[in-house]
């Protein structure tokens, strides 16, 4: 942010300009005001990712060890597929054993930026050493935060829950008071110790660490709704206001900020919720987890979430977490991650088409090829060429050199309109 304010372009900024529909002046202005943030893998600076208004929307894919399953082989299979099928950012949400070993290997394996939630490491260590995930010391919070940045994390996430927010949650009529894992861990710690959130108490130190390492900070909403009944309620808005105040402090220290919020939400509330979050947090890049548009989509959560994501992105969100069909049930397998990413790529492209001038060029090209029945070009221009070609082999026309697909056959509109008069 400091470089952008001085009008200088970094190597990462130059690479962003090569891949995004934005000019140098707009990029520098966006970064200097906090409306655009750049994430980089500190071990591989060749693939920086820009988040913010005027840029293409991005997909974040969660990964990491779990207390239920810590198979490195399966986790790295998911990482490989995530990178292959369109994820722009990985988020290490490790809460199982060997997280340090896993993160080191992850950082050297992928070229994607890696976000994290350091609090999960504190909880796992407390559980392993003390038999209680809440039994950690406030000084451990800052130590782990700094440790993960030094290891190469691109953007650490913190939960800004406070004593006042906890009171508001517990006096509210929420159907599901707590659903954020990190928010709940920190809330339980605050209630047990009667101390304020160490992230808030040490916020200036947190910002100094981020500024020194040129790493943006992510706020992970502690009060996000876990059901439609609680979506976009006063509790959540109170947290957004707090985040807005903290964003101002961060920007004064030249620290870029991202906010990750909005869970379950009815379709009619998504536009106003995104607008509210953007306004309260000074138009910084925002991400959404879904939003899930129904609480009843068990087994098909990727569909529910991708519908919500399309609406949220079109209305101003900048990235979304890829939720799989296994959400709310269990850990995804690689095939679930691939399925989700394919759906999100289509959804986000559709939303970006309506927001960013010039992106429709490839859609126009495939339409021209379709009109001419140029099958090879159509298949190559598809968002997922491999799937398009596999589908063509399975159900496409027997004689592709003849016009028409296998749906209309000889009644193909493109064929009929070109038929010479003498045929009749």
How should each PLM-predicted stretch be described?
Residues 17, 44, 326, 419-420:
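Residue-level detector of alpha-helical segments with a strong bias toward transmembrane helices
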Residues 2-300, 305-319, 393-395, 399, ...:
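Alpha/beta enzyme core
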Residues 168-193, 225-231, 255, 331-424:
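Catalytic or ion-coupling anion/metal-binding cores of large enzyme and transporter domains
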């Amino acid at each position: 942010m400091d470089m952008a304010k001085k009008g200088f372009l970094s190597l990462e900024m130059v690479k962003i300009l090569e891949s995004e529909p934005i000019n140098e002046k707009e990029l520098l202005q966006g970064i200097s005001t906090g409306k655009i943030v750049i994430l980089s893998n500190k071990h591989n600076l060749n693939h920086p990712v820009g988040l913010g208004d005027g840029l293409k929307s991005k997909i974040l894919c969660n990964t990491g060890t779990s207390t239920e399953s810590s198979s490195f082989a399966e986790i790295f299979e998911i990482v490989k597929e995530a990178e292959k099928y369109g994820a722009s950012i990985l988020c290490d949400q490790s809460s199982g054993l060997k997280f340090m070993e896993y993160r080191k290997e992850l950082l050297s394996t992928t070229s994607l930026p890696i976000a994290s939630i350091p609090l999960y490491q504190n909880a796992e260590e407390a559980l392993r050493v003390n038999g209680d995930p809440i039994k950690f010391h406030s000084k451990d919070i800052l130590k782990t935060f700094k440790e993960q940045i030094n290891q190469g994390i691109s953007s650490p996430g913190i939960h800004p829950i406070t004593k006042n927010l906890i009171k508001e949650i517990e006096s509210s009529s929420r159907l599901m008071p707590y659903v954020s894992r990190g928010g709940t861990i920190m809330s339980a710690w605050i209630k047990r110790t009667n101390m304020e959130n160490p992230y808030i108490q040490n916020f200036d130190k947190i910002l100094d660490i981020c500024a020194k390492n040129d790493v943006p900070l992510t706020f992970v909403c502690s009060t996000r709704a876990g059901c439609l009944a609680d979506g976009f309620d006063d509790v959540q808005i109170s947290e957004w206001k707090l985040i807005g105040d903290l964003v101002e402090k961060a920007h004064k220290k030249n620290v870029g900020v991202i906010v990750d919020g909005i869970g379950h939400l009815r379709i009619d509330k998504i536009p106003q919720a995104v607008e509210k979050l953007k306004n309260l947090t000074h138009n910084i890049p925002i991400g959404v987890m879904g939003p899930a548009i129904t609480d009843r989509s068990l087994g098909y959560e990727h569909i529910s979430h991708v519908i919500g994501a399309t609406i949220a992105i079109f209305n101003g969100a900048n990235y979304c977490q890829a939720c799989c069909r296994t959400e709310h049930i269990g850990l995804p397998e690689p095939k679930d991650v691939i399925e989700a990413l394919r759906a999100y790529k289509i959804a986000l492209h559709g939303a970006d088409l309506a927001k960013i001038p010039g992106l429709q060029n490839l859609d126009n090209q495939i339409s021209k090829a379709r009109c001419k029945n140029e099958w090879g070009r159509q298949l190559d221009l598809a968002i997922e060429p491999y799937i398009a070609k596999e589908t063509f082999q399975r159900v496409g026309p027997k004689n592709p050199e003849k016009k028409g697909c296998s749906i209309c056959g000889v009644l193909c509109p493109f064929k009929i309109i070109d038929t010479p008069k003498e045929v009749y």
